[in-house]
Amino acid sequence: MKKNILSLFMMLASGLGANAAADVDFEQNFCDSTLRIDYTFLGNATTQSIAVDKLNMMPRWYGKHAHLDELPVEGNGQITVRKHGTSEVIYRNSFSTLFQEWQSYDEAKNNVKSFENVFLVPMPRDTVDITVDLRNNRHEVVGSLTHTVAPKDVLIRHIGFGNTTPYVTLQQAKDTTKCIHIAYVAEGYQPGEMATFVEDAKIATEALFEHEPFSSMRDRFNIVAVESASVDSGTSEPSKGVWRNTVLGSHFDTFYSNRYLTTLNLKSLHDVLAGVPYEHIIVLVNTSEYGGGGILNSYNLSMTHHPQYRQVVVHEFGHSFAGLADEYAYEAEQIPMYPHDVEPWEKNITTLVDFHNKWENLIEPGTQVPTPMPEDKSEKGKVKSEKSSKVKREKRKGKSEKSEVGAYEGAGYSLKGVYRPYPDCRMRSNQHKDFCPACQKALRDLINFYTE
């Protein structure tokens, strides 16, 4: 008994020591404020350049305080902070960008464009070297910039210390020092429409927390709604000749895709948020037209007044928060985003190159890999109609979720060679009501990474 008590004491002491070390590491290297770095990414389909635009300091730091030199997901790019003149990493984070997506389109073959990007890191106490890397779909670094930041630089702008955009706290985390900070941002709402915006934000919040693992980990999230007013109501629709004056300049037809609703004005987005408690961003656009988008550690953007608003805002948060991939495929158009001889970094798709490090441990023994679709093996990997999906869900009601985890062909916009964990999922369709078991695990692991 004494031995057990001693062991328990040692475990507790060890845990306290680990937490204390993490706190000391942050305190030694960083202040409780945010360094916002504005970058310009420029290039075409085959070249890319990175340039620093502005340095800004904002009050408080709302990101991670532990695991500072670790990445929970690889992303399509990474930002790394090192002690000046050394190789010692004191902070890392990953991201994806619209610029990198644009490089995959035909327009990029004949044109050069620039894109705004904004990254947040904790404010260093001493001079640091910051490296931004861009990676291709083979995980190769194809663009890189290293620059030095001296925290005493008099040209670092101080923003967010006054005239903060009004915001409403929708949910306070149990421990605001170890939580995930989400900010909803109003886009296309006039001053008289702010009550509608706050209600739309509440709807999105309840939709998110209807899904596991968010529902059981709800108290780890701090959520605010930022009342950024626009001159005009709605959003721009270029293909219809409609242009509106909104705070973020959002629009449909991004990359000439009708339903792709985004904003390219990331500096304006972060200007609106200066002084607000935030790390993860959900932009709510005041429109009933279907559309949205989500970019890892950049933002999630969704329409609000379409019947499928709840499903879309949650789906896009899967992209922006956790880097989850789309699990659907197009029958009419194949988009070669994922080489079949390279394992994707996204946690919820695989090419089977390194399946052992994905969700293989969730599959029941004896399950065939690749896995035929339940009830209809001839249609594996194809996008089902809503009616077909509903019928199959009814037939499978008696089965456990784990019994259907496998490797189903058809994901990441490709019918062949890319596999998903489950017949259907929130990352695959608007009809399925849950994240699949593999997505749930990825989300749970990420929430723990940020909050434990």
Name each model feature, range by range.
Residues 196, 293-314:
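Short pre-active-site segment immediately N-terminal to the catalytic Zn-binding motif
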Residues 29-154:
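Beta-strand-enriched, solvent-exposed domains that form extended recognition/catalytic surfaces
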Residues 310-327:
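Active-site recognition of the HExxH zinc-binding catalytic motif
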Residues 174-178, 215-218, 273-278, 295, ...:
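Extracellular/periplasmic catalytic domains that process cell-envelope and extracellular macromolecules
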Residues 1-24:
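Bacterial Sec-dependent N-terminal signal peptides
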Residues 220-296:
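Active-site-proximal segments of metallohydrolase catalytic domains
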Residues 155-212, 225-235:
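Fold-level signature of zinc-dependent metallopeptidase catalytic domains
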